[in-house]
Regions:
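N-terminal hydrophobic or amphipathic helices and topogenic motifs
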Residues: 1-81
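Bilobed "Venus flytrap"/periplasmic-binding protein-like clamshell domains
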Residues: 2-28, 86-144, 149-154
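Structural signal for conserved beta-strand scaffold positions within catalytic alpha/beta enzyme cores
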Residues: 12, 41, 77, 106, ...
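Short glycine-enriched loop/turn motifs at secondary-structure junctions
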Residues: 33, 121, 179-182
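Short C-terminal domain-edge/linker segments immediately following a structured domain
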Residues: 41-43, 70, 89-93, 134-138, ...
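Acidic, polar ligand-binding/catalytic clefts
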Residues: 58-89, 95-96, 151-164
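Hydrophobic/proline-rich hinge and linker segments of small-molecule sensing/allosteric domains
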Residues: 75-98, 168-190
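Pocket-lining segment of extracytoplasmic ligand-binding domains
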Residues: 132-191
Length: 191
């Protein structure tokens, strides 16, 4: 009897919901002798860069990246992230007044929040870092502002305030509040 064997790599964000969704793969509960699934959690910009190199078979991506990879990856109908009335937040120190060319920390060049942010603030100077470091960078004065994503939008320092919701930028660009803000999804290699 011929045994078919296939290894499939799946990469996702370290968000609590993603960790939960992919736990069966991470613990080996979804694999058998015909199909071996492996899971890896990484920050979204690392995942985006991995897709540009074709590293994973299935990978979480920012929708801002998709125009760069659509010929190599197909979007899946599952595990997508949209915001409605909420989403990434531009944060600053409580008493900050932003200048036109302020320095901002973003979670990556190819992220959806970076794309949306660059449309709204074309003169801002972007610095890219892991999303877990953004709050600290604003508090320390390393940057003037930062865009928070994931769970960090729910619980950040009292020394900071929300300057602007990226949801509001999206609504202004879309001309309506009826369209959800596209953030990210899962893409599968077409090979």
């Amino acid at each position: 009897m011929n045994k078919f064997s296939k290894n499939i790599s799946v990469a996702h964000s370290p968000d609590a919901d993603d960790i939960f969704m992919y736990a069966a793969i991470a613990f080996g509960w979804a694999s058998d002798e015909r199909l071996k699934l492996s899971a890896k959690a990484d920050d979204i910009e690392s995942l985006n860069l991995s897709c540009l190199k074709g590293v994973y078979d299935v990978c979480a991506i920012s929708f801002g990246l998709y125009p760069h990879i659509f010929s190599d990856y197909a979007l899946l109908d599952t595990a997508t992230s949209f915001g409605r009335g909420y989403g990434p937040k531009l944060i600053v120190k409580k008493n900050a007044v932003l200048k036109r060319n302020f320095k901002v920390a973003l979670s990556g060049k190819h992220t959806s929040n970076a794309l949306l942010f660059s449309i709204a603030y074309p003169d801002a100077r972007a610095v890219y870092m892991n999303f877990l470091e953004i709050e600290k960078a604003v508090l320390s004065g390393q940057v003037d502002a930062g865009v928070l994503i994931h769970e960090s939008i729910l619980d950040f320092s009292d020394e900071l305030r929300v300057e602007r919701e990226l949801w509001d930028i999206w609504c202004e660009l879309a001309g309506t509040e009826k369209l959800p803000l596209p953030l990210g999804g899962m893409a599968m290699g077409q090979s």
